[in-house]
Amino acid sequence: KVNKGQLNQFRKILHKKNNIGIKITYKEQLSPRGLPDAFLLGEKFIEKDNVALILGDNFFYGQSLTAQLKQCVKLKSGARVFLHPVKNPSLYGVANINKKNKISRIIEKPKKTSSNLAITGLYFFDNKVVDYSKKLKPSQRHELEIADLLNKYRSNNRLKAEFIGRGGTWLDTGNIEDFYSASNYVSS
């Protein structure tokens, strides 16, 4: 899924750089309808497959990450969400974890929270994600919210947390300052 007006830019860049033999299919989101809308747009592409959603403004790094991703690709049912501790949880969707290391609550950009575990932009879902997304109601922002989708999986005891392993990190590069910080991290 790409935002309105960006489709040709992505085609131009990715077509030139696609030397690894993969086929890329694009769907343009014509208006802001939220992250779960990507699954509705891609319903025919997804069919009976499981899917991953990776937000383009996120940077992930870590030696153990490859092994974790390979395990998540083998997902048979349910959903996996990657969590990472942050200093300012009110800027992110946050997950509360209980004593059994299960997600007990998901809150979108809480003013106060007992957790510092941000929900990163890396998700794995079984093929029920399309059906679950169809049942979501738009939020006050008139968008389908990823937190609501995750809560649907959680309420059915089908959501598991993944933690970026030791030596790994996640950086949100959604604004210019964060992008600059990620650039400095990579160059150091």
What does each model-identified segment do?
Residues S31-L35, N88-P89, K112, T169-W170:
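A short acidic, often aromatic-flanked loop/helix-cap motif at beta-alpha or helix-coil junctions
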Residues A52, T66, K70-V73, K102-S188:
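Catalytic-core segments of class I nucleotidyltransferases/pyrophosphorylases
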Residues K1-L55, F59-A67, N175:
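Conserved N-terminal catalytic core of the sugar/cofactor nucleotidyltransferase
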Residues L53-G56, F82-P85, G165:
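Short beta-strand segments
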Residues I20-K23, E47-N50, G56, L75-A79, ...:
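Short coil/turn connectors at secondary-structure junctions
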Residues G62-S90:
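Conserved donor-nucleotide/metal-binding helix-loop-beta segment in metal-dependent transferases, i.e.
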